[in-house]
Each structure stands twice: as structure tokens, then as C-alpha cells.
Amino acid sequence: MIIFYQPWVNALPSTPRHASPEQLEKTVRYLTQTVHPRSADNIDNLNRSAEYIKEVFVSSGARVTSQDVPITGGPYKNIVADYGPADGPLIIIGAHYDSASSYENDQLTYTPGADDNASGVAGLLELARLLQQQAPKTGVQLVAYASEEPPFFRSDEMGSAVHAASLERPVRLMIALEMIGYYDSAPGSQDYPYPAMSWLYPDRGDFIAWSAEYRISTPFVR
């Protein structure tokens, strides 16, 4: 039996927009055009992507480090930006910057990787720019992950898995920005893996979904 849990929440009022649409688009275009493809077999483009991300993090005033992801075909790198206190609990927000490839009719093809996941990286870099204007009281770590897509998906060789295994500070909250760039307001544009979910959730793909483990106990600050 499958049970769907629909939390009782109220919509929050709109807040002023501070992120730059122009910068979001600039990042997506750079990743999907200038350094395309960003698949595992295109290490030069992945390294150029990592350098671009690193430069934005540095310009935001973060403490920036590169973390080696020691897997075959590398070197792949996670780019880590720290804000706020250097010890104590962490809030981690991450997004992978590689893109997928596949074989179609025995031909290797590369996805542009715009929604998956240049959009997540663009959001991550805008968070970096916004954090430049803040002084967080809790440590915040922004991480651009390498090696999320196959052949590394769901393995210990994922960049996110390597990063998680290296953490020594307690993690209060982790948010992964994944495919946040696609929008469709047409009726029926949103479907779900289980038909019953359509009874609980909108039929238009004009929202960003927040999914989490139901047992999460950390309170969220609005």
C-alpha cells in the first residue's frame, strides 16, 4: 500500500525579488553553450565549469576550496564555498554541475543540461551573491557537485557522496537544487509517477516542489 502525505501549509506572501534574472540566464547560457557538453567524458569542459563557479564564489567573499573527487577518468572537483562561522552546525545547499549523455541508435548524444542542472547551478550562484550581502549566524556551505550523472549516479563516486563522507561538522539542513528551471502554466502540463498524487498536487508545472523525508525534525525559518 502506498500512502501519500499532504502537509497542511499556507502559502507565504510574496517577497521582493533580489536575484538577478540576467545573471541566472547568463549562467545557464554559459554552462549549456560555452562549456557544452559537461558529461563525464568531457573533463576539460567540467574543469572550465568548475573554474567559472569558483570565480563567482570567490567574488562573493566566500572561503572557497576545491575538493578532489578521486574516481576513474578525473580529476573531478567539488567546489565548496563557506560563509559565516567556521565551526558549529552547517546549512548546506548544493547543486551538481555535470550533465548527462546517452546512446540513441548507437550514437552518443549529449543533453544541453539546461534544466538538469544548469538551472540549479544558476540558483546556487545567485545565493552566493545574496549571501555576500548577509552575515549568517549559522555556517552556510554552498557546494557545486561533480559526477552526479551516470555512470556515477547512486554510487559512492557521486560528488555529493564524497562531500558528505568528508563532513566533520553537524548538518542542520541540506537542500539540493535540482531542475528548478522548467516552467509550464498550461493545464495538464504536470504529471506524477503515481496517479493518486494528482488528487493532491497541481496539474500545472508552474511551481518548485520541496520534497523531504517526513521524519525531518529541524524547524524551518521563514
Where are these regions (language model features)?
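Hydrophobic membrane-insertion alpha-helices, especially the h-region
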Residues: 1-4
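Solvent-exposed, acidic/flexible segments
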Residues: 17-24, 39-50, 74, 90, ...
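Extracytoplasmic/secreted proteins, especially bacterial periplasmic and envelope-associated proteins
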Residues: 23-26, 30, 44, 48-59, ...
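A non-catalytic alpha/beta surface segment that caps or lines the substrate-entry region
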Residues: 29-88
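Soluble periplasmic/extracytoplasmic beta-strand elements of cell-envelope proteins
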Residues: 30, 78-82, 90-96, 139-145, ...
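Solvent-exposed loop/turn segments at secondary-structure junctions
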Residues: 70-72, 85-87, 97-101, 147-151, ...
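Acidic/histidine-rich catalytic neighborhood of metal-dependent amide-processing enzymes
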Residues: 109-215
